[in-house]
Amino acid sequence: MQFMFAALKLELGDTLYYLLIFAALLLLVKHFAWGPVTKMMEERRQKVISDLDQAESDRKKAELLANQREAALKDSKQEATQILSTAKSNAEKTKNNIISQADQEAAAIRKRASEDAAQAKTDALNEARDQVADISVAIAEKVISKNLSAADQKDLVDQFIKGLND
């Protein structure tokens, strides 16, 4: 061993001195620095744990919020589909009601027009009968009042008809 120390040119006394200084420094470090350093390390460890727990909590909250938003979106899509379906159904019912009313009104108009045409026809026939009767009476009166030959009667009827056309 002395050979080693001789090679390093260290004396046993110097070595003991260095060991004592080193031990004293270790005691001083342990007494003054080790406590605050370990306290700082423990605080840092607690902060890291707290941050990790907070991050996990935030992640769970975000996941829950995302699930809630997804469910709300799904519900709103379902509601929109239902509203659209109801609107289409109502529009179809309204269309059918309008068409039905239009058909009924058209049938009523056709019926009234048919009745009006029948009434106009009846009125025209009645008026024509009345006119024919009046013409016949007028012709008969003229024929009776004059003693006319057949040719004169024909001329008289023709003149009377011409007078009606004018």
UniProtKB/Swiss-Prot annotation:
InterPro entries given in the database record: ATP_synth_b/b'su_bac/chlpt, ATP_synth_F0_bsu_bac, ATP_synthase_B_chain
Membrane topology: Single-pass membrane protein
Residues annotated as transmembrane: 15-37
Subcellular location as annotated: Cell membrane
Gene Ontology terms for molecular function: proton-transporting ATP synthase activity, rotational mechanism; proton-transporting ATPase activity, rotational mechanism
Coiled-coil intervals, chain numbering: none
Keywords from the UniProt entry: ATP synthesis, Cell membrane, CF(0), Hydrogen ion transport, Ion transport, Membrane, Transmembrane, Transmembrane helix, Transport
Main location per the UniProt record: membrane
Gene Ontology cellular component list: plasma membrane; proton-transporting ATP synthase complex
Subunit-structure text: F-type ATPases have 2 components, F(1) - the catalytic core - and F(0) - the membrane proton channel. F(1) has five subunits: alpha(3), beta(3), gamma(1), delta(1), epsilon(1). F(0) has three main subunits: a(1), b(2) and c(10-14). The alpha and beta chains form an alternating ring which encloses part of the gamma chain. F(1) is attached to F(0) by a central stalk formed by the gamma and epsilon chains, while a peripheral stalk is formed by the delta and b chains.
Family: Belongs to the ATPase B chain family.
HAMAP family recorded: ATP_synth_b_bprime
Function of the protein: F(1)F(0) ATP synthase produces ATP from ADP in the presence of a proton or sodium gradient. F-type ATPases consist of two structural domains, F(1) containing the extramembraneous catalytic core and F(0) containing the membrane proton channel, linked together by a central stalk and a peripheral stalk. During catalysis, ATP synthesis in the catalytic domain of F(1) is coupled via a rotary mechanism of the central stalk subunits to proton translocation.
NCBIfam families: ATP_synt_b (TIGR01144)
Protein name per UniProt: ATP synthase subunit b
Record organism: Lactobacillus johnsonii (strain CNCM I-12250 / La1 / NCC 533)
